[in-house]
Amino acid sequence: MERLNTGWRHSAPVAPIALSEESDTDRTDLFHAAHLAVQALDLKPACRYVLDQLVGCYRGEPVGGRLLVWPSNEFLEQRTGLSERTIRYVVSALLAAGVLSAKDSANGKRFAIRSKQGQIVDAYGLDLSPLLARRREFANKVDVLKDERERRRRLFDE
């Protein structure tokens, strides 16, 4: 495990994440992975709202091999109805949980860098790649939790 240098933000240790070039990731896959992460990690509702909005911001094309999104906190406030402080808290909680990783600019803002033709060549923001990379782990944990709930239900019914 290594620590990624994000500029100014303290980040949790993460394993390098590489997306295969032929991977055709769409929002449906990301929404499914987010749903599994919410269940597996028992994330609070505010985390779920913000994570859903972040996945909804994904444009369908990786930027530099990463699934980057760059919505502002103000945008997330408007879409979720949460305060800016709550948005900051939730984003840091998602980063600490390893659901997201950050690619920070020098000033900490999220934005895309476009070519003269208007194509996105790079971006700074939040990376959804860990969400997709850990999808199998989340699915396994959800299965274990379901089995445990079923076992408890059967014990209670007896």
Language model: regions and residue ranges:
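A short, conserved structural fragment
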Residues: A96-S105
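A short alpha-helical element within helix-turn-helix/winged-helix DNA-binding domains
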Residues: G60, G65-G81, L94
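Short, Lys/Arg-rich nucleic-acid/phosphate-binding segment
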Residues: S105-R114
